Amino acid sequence: MSIKSDKWIRRMAQEHGMIEPFVERQVRGEQDSRVISFGVSSYGYDVRCADEFKVFTNINSATVDPKNFDAGSFVDIKSDVCIIPPNSFALARTVEYFRIPRDVLTICLGKSTYARCGIIVNVTPLEPEWEGHVTLEFSNTTTLPAKIYANEGVAQMLFLQSDEECEVSYKDRGGKYQGQRGVTLPRT
């Protein structure tokens, strides 16, 4: 299994629609504005966060249960920024839609810009032949409100290609998050 380079990522996005929309260079700033970088890097792709957020609030229940999750535990926000309360979390989605090849596993890591502010990004691996918008989870580990910026970089995807295809892909087994669009809540 090997990590894939910017050349491979660019080719797969342009010829096979692996990432849409696709930014073929790393964007660090536009005109005089500062942005958190996004687009292709040497061995990865920095994804952007869309402007749709679900911010967790504990007004309806005392227990968070992944088997019986209360959608009312979130406040929906559409904005260029999202303020996450102290010691809380928010869900969002990537701007980009992914189509992962059958012989590739994709790992997501948070960006240091956010990590150094106490904001942790969590995403499970994107499995072979999974496709959809990636639901992002942001944890604010600080005792102060934390800000997330829409349409800027929030995490980096690393593409690992196996030397052989898997026997059963995410698509083959009818994965419950296949083809997800928008911010997707837990499913069982």
Swiss-Prot record:
Pathway where this protein functions: Pyrimidine metabolism; dUMP biosynthesis; dUMP from dCTP (dUTP route): step 1/2
First-tier enzyme category under EC: hydrolase
Keywords assigned: Hydrolase, Nucleotide metabolism, Nucleotide-binding
Biological processes, Gene Ontology terms: dUMP biosynthetic process; dUTP biosynthetic process; nucleobase-containing small molecule interconversion
InterPro entries: dCTP_deaminase (IPR011962), dUTPase-like_sf (IPR036157), dUTPase_trimeric (IPR033704)
Gene3D superfamilies registered for this protein in UniProt: 2.70.40.10
Catalytic reaction equation(s): dCTP + H2O + H(+) = dUTP + NH4(+)
Transmembrane segments: none
Active site: E137 (proton donor/acceptor)
List of residues binding dCTP: K111, S112, T113, Y114, A115, R116, T135, L136, E137, Q156, Y170, Q180
One Gene Ontology MF term: dCTP deaminase activity
Job of this protein: Catalyzes the deamination of dCTP to dUTP.
Family as reported in the entry's similarity comment: Belongs to the dCTP deaminase family.
Name of the molecule in the record: dCTP deaminase
Top-level taxonomy: Bacteria, Pseudomonadati, Pseudomonadota, Gammaproteobacteria, Pseudomonadales
